């Protein structure tokens, strides 16, 4: 386990909004969408791959309720799963939520039990009682820093639920006749620039996080960020927010950004280099138990998607003078289905 230097509390008199660990991992695995009522044999392969850190990217249980006693029982069922317990003994577990563990399908800022749900979620993931995640007015967003200097990874986990504005959608007939045949969802992007997914306070936090130390910056998004508009939930429904993130990366000359995401019930790798100073990679891993055969179109996809259960990997070979990064997707048996390897220097255009 990693030695914790500071966790969302006081260090040298300064209030921190992140956790700081002394050691840098060489293998981070991640996944999303684990239904507590289903078997989870994929955890056996994950454990065999020996992650140092595992990131749960949302829909970690399928709560879908306003009954908080029911939500607690669903978390309890996940916690009792033998594969989950074994992973917890082996790796550092960190987590953000998505809609189903937040409380309702595709829910946003108007979900009525979000405060109670927050405490149940953070209790399950053993967040300290004095953590700012428990009391912030604008969500459970947080970050983690591993290592320091030339060998460091900064994991940023925004909260895409707490402040998310409502999303417009097409009519039932339009969805059935036009969207569904194309494997697309019912939602419509907000092109007015008035709607937001995370809210202004969280944007202020995120801008500061992007400027913090960390040679590799992993943004763990519960929803896809680079993919084309699919009609399902994603950053594409909030194009102003999506562009704002790209602009902040350029404005502050942030090197080393890599994106990981969940939600979709299929896995894929995306590559985006439009109007940026270096390419962005995104690995979408979903789900640990959930599957969806009708994969939506995505012009940024590289390699083949996987429509069965899967998990993602970020490996860093720190032994190389120019560290080698390997991004991958793995199936239930631990076999690689999509893998990409590149030098860290390709993500470092800024001095």
Locations of regions flagged by a protein language model:
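Bacterial N-terminal signal peptides that target proteins for export
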Residues: 1-9
